[in-house]
Amino acid sequence: MEQLTTLPRPGDPGAMEPWALPTWHSWTPGRGGEPSSAAPSIADTPPAALQLQELRSEESSKPKGDGSSRPVGGTDPEGAEACLPSLGQQASSSGPACQRPEDEEVEAFLKAKLNMSFGDRPNLELLRALGELRQRCAILKEENQMLRKSSFPETEEKVRRLKRKNAELAVIAKRLEERARKLQETNLRVVSAPLPRPGTSLELCRKALARQRARDLSETASALLAKDKQIAALQRECRELQARLTLVGKEGPQWLHVRDFDRLLRESQREVLRLQRQIALRNQRETLPLPPSWPPGPALQARAGAPAPGAPGEATPQEDADNLPVILGEPEKEQRVQQLESELSKKRKKCESLEQEARKKQRRCEELELQLRQAQNENARLVEENSRLSGRATEKEQVEWENAELRGQLLGVTQERDSALRKSQGLQSKLESLEQVLKHMREVAQRRQQLEVEHEQARLSLREKQEEVRRLQQAQAEAQREHEGAVQLLESTLDSMQARVRELEEQCRSQTEQFSLLAQELQAFRLHPGPLDLLTSALDCGSLGDCPPPPCCCSIPQPCRGSGPKDLDLPPGSPGRCTPKSSEPAPATLTGVPRRTAKKAESLSNSSHSESIHNSPKSCPTPEVDTASEVEELEADSVSLLPAAPEGSRGGARIQVFLARYSYNPFEGPNENPEAELPLTAGEYIYIYGNMDEDGFFEGELMDGRRGLVPSNFVERVSDDDLLTSLPPELADLSHSSGPELSFLSVGGGGSSSGGQSSVGRSQPRPEEEDAGDELSLSPSPEGLGEPPAVPYPRRLVVLKQLAHSVVLAWEPPPEQVELHGFHICVNGELRQALGPGAPPKAVLENLDLWAGPLHISVQALTSRGSSDPLRCCLAVGARAGVVPSQLRVHRLTATSAEITWVPGNSNLAHAIYLNGEECPPASPSTYWATFCHLRPGTPYQAQVEAQLPPQGPWEPGWERLEQRAATLQFTTLPAGPPDAPLDVQIEPGPSPGILIISWLPVTIDAAGTSNGVRVTGYAIYADGQKIMEVASPTAGSVLVELSQLQLLQVCREVVVRTMSPHGESADSIPAPITPALAPASLPARVSCPSPHPSPEARAPLASASPGPGDPSSPLQHPAPLGTQEPPGAPPASPSREMAKGSHEDPPAPCSQEEAGAAVLGTSEERTASTSTLGEKDPGPAAPSLAKQEAEWTAGEACPASSSTQGARAQQAPNTEMCQGGDPGSGLRPRAEKEDTAELGVHLVNSLVDHGRNSDLSDIQEEEEEEEEEEEEELGSRTCSFQKQVAGNSIRENGAKSQPDPFCETDSDEEILEQILELPLQQFCSKKLFSIPEEEEEEEEDEEEEKSGAGCSSRDPGPPEPALLGLGCDSGQPRRPGQCPLSPESSRAGDCLEDMPGLVGGSSRRRGGGSPEKPPSRRRPPDPREHCSRLLSNNGPQASGRLGPTRERGGLPVIEGPRTGLEASGRGRLGPSRRCSRGRALEPGLASCLSPKCLEISIEYDSEDEQEAGSGGISITSSCYPGDGEAWGTATVGRPRGPPKANSGPKPYPRLPAWEKGEPERRGRSATGRAKEPLSRATETGEARGQDGSGRRGPQKRGVRVLRPSTAELVPARSPSETLAYQHLPVRIFVALFDYDPVSMSPNPDAGEEELPFREGQILKVFGDKDADGFYQGEGGGRTGYIPCNMVAEVAVDSPAGRQQLLQRGYLSPDILLEGSGNGPFVYSTAHTTGPPPKPRRSKKAESEGPAQPCPGPPKLVPSADLKAPHSMVAAFDYNPQESSPNMDVEAELPFRAGDVITVFGGMDDDGFYYGELNGQRGLVPSNFLEGPGPEAGGLDREPRTPQAESQRTRRRRVQC
């Protein structure tokens, strides 16, 4: 039965019953309606089959019987595979054996039937049935054989494979068993061993066992899977066999049905079993005797055949069975059958039991396998844990060993430490005793030295004071004489100048006639070219008289048509080169050729003088100048002609030079058309045409010729003075030009020369242009470097015809609408032909040597703007001429950029630019330069310029043969670093005595902050090679040298500044000499007056030009007569002023008022005006004639001149005023008066050298500040101040528009000014662009206010002005720093005034930013970030004398910008406080706003030491912009110098009205970081500070008296609306720490009525807590009122009785106050009663301190020698700068310990630091860490300081990054 398939393994799902076999597919349908998946089944008759097998196994001894006798269930351990071969063998063996015996049996039955005569019928029937069965069996056997032959080999092969796999699995199982055994043995050993502590080894073992178990399981699973796959494959084959068998069955006999076949099969099986039984019985009865009737043959044969070993297994039984019925009887047969059946049943039972046992064993085997796996896993885990525990045990042993070793070491170290401690204690005790002795000795020695020095100082101060009184008397008398002389001189000068005007007008007319004749001749020459070319050239350049050909560089625009050749600097052989050198191309293009009207005639008529003027600076370094009278005449001539400028033929847009402050990429911006805008690079110069449009954009042009829109907030105007001051010396003589020339250069009706200076200024970046004699010295970028207004040039120059020696040219005229005066045709730079106006654009050039080589032909257009660039329209002709560019060279090379230029072979072609093979943007036609940016330092590059032919093919003859069209150039960028050195280093007197201002022009940095490829970090200042200071700001422009550094500078000769970077410092800048005038000027008791007499060379340019306000030759950039109100659109006309060098080089000498006035023009204005020009920004079309202004000024002057020159200068500076006694004259204030009458309190001028860096917002603060001071001076019965003359631009009376303050001019952003003024409360803005950090902006603004010029009285606080001395000096008059150092006497005199009721009681004038005085036009809205308000009160030491009644202008309840306490609202002498206010403009308070580049002054106090040293109590607190997280800082205040208990206390905070509290309060941080003290609310909010409830600004008092520095904060401004309803609140006891008089000390307007006065030590009763403004409601002396919280301290009383006793006592002695807490029945609590003071911060920016403090008594002289007096002080706390100092330069500070005696030199500086010495080392010492007698020890006004007061004083410094 080959069709049988293997059964599933026992226990598997789907396992079949042990007896069930697969059914036949063809006969029996499978369960579920689908064909059965098994072979034909004989499950219905399993017993018969089993009996047959059993019988056969019993009867046969062959091994195959064993296999067949097994149950079909497949309980064989080998699996079901073993069953198949057994069954197959059984079928194969039984099949053939059954056929022959059955045939024989049939025959035997037939024979028996015959013999027995049919006696046994049942047997016959059986035999018959048996025969049928045999036949059927034979048929089935044949079919089985056929099936076996077809499928058995394949099945047998698979079975063999499965057996092999079984064997392999068995081997694997044996291996696993062996491994498990080994693991168990190992596990037993591990378990028996002592278990260490669990450790990492156990985990490792577990992991290893887990990995091994996973591998084993994966192997077993893969094996089982493979076996299952094989079983599945066999099952599929069986199904296929079933299908085949089905087909075969269908082809079998049709009569055999399935059921019949099954039934017959069962019957046959039963019959076979029965026959087998019979055979078995026959075999058992073999030994029985046979009947005689039986033939012996068959029986013998049966018996013989039965045991035959080789016979088939069933042959003998079959024969016996055939004979059995004959031998046995029927009963026996039945008995035998029963016996066989019973045996069969037994066998069946036994088989079933065996099957059950097999199943049990199989299950047992599976369980054992599972246990084996579990045991293996457990073993692996145990092994892993064992290894981990072993590792832990090892580690434990190691740790225990190390612990033991460490214990031993610890014991030894402990013993050593104990011994060292004992030694240290002993040494410490000895050291302390020695320190006490040393301390005592030092104190004695220092005290002796101090007394000696004080004695010497007193003698010196007395001598100086006597000398000063004498000088003042002399100066007053001399000023009177000079005033009278000046008036006479001015009158005579006016007459002479008017005569000169008439003469010049006549000359002008004659020149006009001559010019017309020359023009006719020129037209004739033009019609006859050729041999007449040279004559034409001579006529053009010489006969016309306007422009004699200069032999050298001429960068002045030529005012004639023939001036073109001189305008461009070209190499020989290049087109357009007409002169050997020309520094810059045609500055005439700035404003066009001079007017062809009276202007031209005028310049022509004055030919002799004009020729000398037109000579280049190199050709005439010392131009002849007529006498002073002639100078005045020329000035008058220019004055009379200048107003006609706007109406003339100057059609070009006004041009201005701007500097890009930041980089700008239009495509990253928000605008819709970025292509219309220009990309900017920081530090790049831009030429601006016209005014700003409504969107805040200018129309500008870059130096490379690109034009477009320029955002106004990214650029900053370059003042004309900056341009001229940056020129080489030989170029500075450009101001020698006559009036017509300068009007030609000027950009506005006022004659500002920004245009000309722009061209000049651009010459400096290209110094190589003048040195390139054989190379191309290009004119700058088109319309950018040399031609700012872009002179239109011809286009498309072509050769119409070329002959042997001549060419015919044609071109297109300039497409722009411009007045053409003709064309110049040049060959190799030589003028060959000139065409007049109206001539056709064609020319014939003859006598050309075309075969000698290429000739460069260029065509220039002569327009009303000047001559065009010859390289814009040029062509190469002749032999070897091509389109390849020539003379390719590097024009400008830096570390990160390079500019190349070339001479185009044909200007009609565009040129492709390649850098290192990479294509760059091409150069358009008529462009001959390219700039490469963002290069790498020190990197070689190869630049290639290739002429691009037109795409449509050659359009010139011969171009198809061109081979070379490119020129190549190799260059290497400069190595990175060091950075460039700063420029224009200058030293000036500082804002207060003892301070110098060192200023410089910062290096230009790009957007990344780098210069020359390295990042700029700051600047270092060196004095004679020794570094004295560093400024950590890359944009710093000045620094104040403090007292300690000043001592070094007094012996130095020069100062240099270096730029710092991570790659080192730059080279030294040009040294700035320390003139003898500076050192005395910086001392408080000395007055030095540089001689005001300029040399004739210095005065010559002054008289020879009529510059505009921006011209450096203008003495005052903003002057306007006191009564002159200029129309809003008119730029302020400024008369000439001296060149910068005029007075700088003058030696110091005593001088008269007139001389001093001239010196003011030469020095003060020279710096202040040159760096902060005001009028040049006003784009008004016209200005009142200078002649008219001159008349007005002359009428307003009363100063006679001592000489014609001085008179001329006085006339040129009519805005200045003379101070003579108490006369309110409006003349020039002489320098002598400034310096000699020091007590007049004139504000010092702080020239701002780095003005170019600053933004254009400061003119607001300066204008308003000046205006404010003017009105104060007016109301104080003072003389007309310089402020009021400056107020020609700034006074806003009668509603007239005031012009920007010239000294505060912020270049050309006047529009910004006015727009800012439109904003409410934004009157005071800094000059900084506010995209830089606010701290830096504030610092820069400080410096700017120190240096930006005299126009801002609040910015340049001078010494206190004694209004009652009869000297008519106005404190508003600006002064140069140091020109008028304050003498102590004068300062005291001014100080005393503030205590006078008439002066103190007055209400301050109020003027608001919302006043209609400011024109609300032409101002771009400022960036909110750009408004940094400087809350500087004008109460600086120099402003102290500004007293007297003040009024509110126009009665308008206007709001002033943020101010400090005294300016905000009241009489308090508060130090200027700097605040960054949101949306607010800066208020300039003090020129002492320190150098922005240095550190910002955050000193929240001053000390009495400083006060007495003459460095008044002005302190500046800066806080950041409100949004930056910093609160609005509080201004600290200096302590006044007065008798003890008089004015020695700090002033209270200014409190704000309630309406100001709408903005959330920003509690500023004092330097100590204590937030519990309220800030100055006047400076915290974004609203106006210091205004009372009605919106008016509180009275502003300029008193010298400032708050005590230790207060650290201002008195908060009180809200008047608050009531006194505090009686119900709990009562607290406070003690007054300082004297307080609200009337004189409080900034609040109603202080005398609502605030409570008290004395130091007075007991005060306080109700409740302080209000939001920092005021308590209290009671004292029988009065109730407000008490400032920062001037009192609470007293902690133990009992109510003690409190009552204290109230009755009403006073505490100073000793108790000094003792602090714990020494009495009560203690008073203040901030920081114990512990060291806060970390001191130093600010390197020196604040301007008042030279003296007010004192009710006679002033006390503080000589300069006192600054150096040594003193002894004791350290109260330990101080280590490395740990405790917040400052960056900790190496400059001294470390010390508590108890150290430190020798202090001089007074405390503005940062709160002394310069001291300890143990031979010198450095800075924080004053709040010291105690004991200071420099002012012994002074009556010294206020005892408590530790609490000390702890409140801190220093704060912010370094700009």
Curated annotation (Swiss-Prot):
Predominantly expressed in brain, pituitary gland and thymus in adults. In adult brain, highest expression found in temporal lobe and the putamen, followed by amygdala, caudate nucleus, cerebral cortex, occipital and frontal lobe. A high expression level is also observed in fetal tissues like brain, heart, kidney and thymus. The keyword Repeat applies. SMART domains: FN3, SH3. CDD domains: FN3, SH3_RIM-BP_1, SH3_RIM-BP_2, SH3_RIM-BP_3. PROSITE patterns: FN3, SH3. It comes from Homo sapiens (Human). Residues 653-720, 1625-1693, 1764-1831 form the SH3 domain. This is Peripheral-type benzodiazepine receptor-associated protein 1.
